[in-house]
């Protein structure tokens, strides 16, 4: 299919990727070996679509190859601390062809991989170190109806200080009375003993690692949570420029990079000022979460005319139920495709699909009758919507699907 980019020419079966894992983890906290088939087969057991279930299960013994259709969302956070070295290696071992670093900056303007500029309180061990004294808002225990909280930002500390911290699972207990209670351990369905001290990464280090793993890059320029310019001359444009300059400095071909942002101004800045990266700029479109938003083919056509090729809405913007309760492409999905835009979507394997509070499945909630129904969602996204890639918190499941049902094991 045209939207599946096969890395087979430069890749090996996943068993070889596991050997890469072993080599790259020498001297690093040991991570549990991952099996890309196990999770997919577990989910297939509760998949209502029997034809799809049997087809997926028939592929269990096949070779599995990396694919750009499988995009690692922050690494592999269903089992590893997000944006950790260990999580990135696990994602590559699961066949993710593209790996994400969410990019923000430290007090001394070093670019680092964090989902948010101010998430260190829950995604690192900073509250358990002397650096807690530098946090924007120190730990405050739960008190009556007031939940426990803390705010620690990358801009509170230097790069050298950032590198002393551990990456930890982004789980917290808002009823906690102490820091130890606040930093709740991860309960993972895929890793028996989740890491408690993963290795934090700078953006440059992530480039070096992902390049060594033979994968592509999708850095997201995170919205600053400080006033810009943060220092004289370091305005939003300089920040956006610095992200791309780190790929040039590392000698990475622009064709391997998919820079992303929720801020359309960042996208137009890249398109207008960095033509070598323009074709693969990805706009993360969250407009569908606004009350009353209505998409239109004319709007999508105008975006493409301005130079946008790839749009990346969340899954609920692409899915709907028809009159008989079947999952089908949404109006948004049909319009975007008819306007000629390519689509990437997020985030697969994020949260319980049967939880009514999980907004990722809100438009199709009544159809989500089992955990395995996620595979039906993936099937619709791949075949009916025609997305070119899916972000996943456990990319092995998407890799398995792509190898089994999208022709990866056939010669081109």
Predicted regions and their residues:
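Bacterial N-terminal signal peptides
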Residues: 13-23
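Phosphate-group recognition and catalysis centered on beta-loop-alpha active-site segments
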Residues: 27-412
């Amino acid at each position: 299919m045209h939207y599946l980019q096969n890395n087979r020419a430069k890749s090996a079966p996943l068993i070889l990727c596991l050997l890469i894992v072993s080599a790259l983890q020498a001297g690093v906290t040991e991570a549990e070996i991952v099996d890309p088939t196990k999770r997919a087969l577990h989910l297939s057991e509760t998949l209502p679509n029997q034809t799809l279930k049997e087809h997926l299960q028939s592929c269990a013994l096949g070779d599995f190859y990396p694919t750009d259709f499988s995009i690692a969302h922050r690494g592999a956070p269903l089992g590893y601390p997000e944006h950790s070295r260990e999580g990135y290696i696990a994602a590559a071992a699961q066949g993710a062809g593209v790996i994400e670093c969410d990019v923000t900056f430290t007090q001394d303007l070093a670019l680092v991989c964090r989902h948010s500029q101010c998430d260190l309180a829950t995604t690192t061990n900073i509250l358990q170190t002397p650096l807690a004294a530098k946090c924007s808002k120190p730990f405050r225990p739960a008190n009556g109806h007031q939940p426990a909280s803390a705010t620690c930002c990358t801009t509170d500390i230097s790069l050298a200080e950032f590198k002393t911290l551990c990456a930890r699972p982004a789980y917290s207990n808002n009823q906690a009375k102490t820091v130890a209670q606040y930093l709740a351990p991860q309960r993972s369905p895929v890793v028996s003993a989740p890491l408690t001290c993963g290795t934090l990464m700078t953006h440059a280090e992530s480039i070096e690692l992902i390049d060594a793993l033979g994968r592509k890059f999708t850095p997201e320029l995170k919205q600053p949570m400080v006033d810009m310019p943060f220092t004289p001359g370091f305005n939003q444009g300089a920040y956006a420029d610095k992200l791309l300059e780190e790929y040039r400095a590392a000698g990475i071909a622009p064709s391997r990079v998919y820079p992303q942002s929720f801020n359309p101004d960042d996208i137009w800045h890249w398109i207008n000022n960095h033509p070598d990266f323009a074709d693969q700029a990805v706009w993360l479109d969250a407009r569908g979460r606004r009350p009353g938003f209505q998409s239109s083919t004319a709007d999508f056509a105008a975006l493409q005319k301005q130079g946008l090729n790839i749009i990346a809405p969340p899954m609920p913007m692409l899915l709907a139920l028809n009159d008989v309760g079947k999952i089908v492409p949404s109006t948004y999905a049909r319009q975007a495709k008819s306007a000629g835009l390519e689509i990437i979507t997020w985030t697969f394997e994020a949260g319980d699909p049967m939880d009514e509070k999980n907004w990722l499945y809100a438009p199709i909630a009544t159809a989500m009758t089992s955990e395995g129904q996620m595979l039906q969602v993936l099937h619709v996204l791949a075949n009916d919507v025609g997305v070119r890639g899916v972000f996943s918190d456990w990319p092995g499941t998407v890799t398995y699907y792509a190898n089994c049902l999208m022709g990866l094991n056939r010669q081109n």
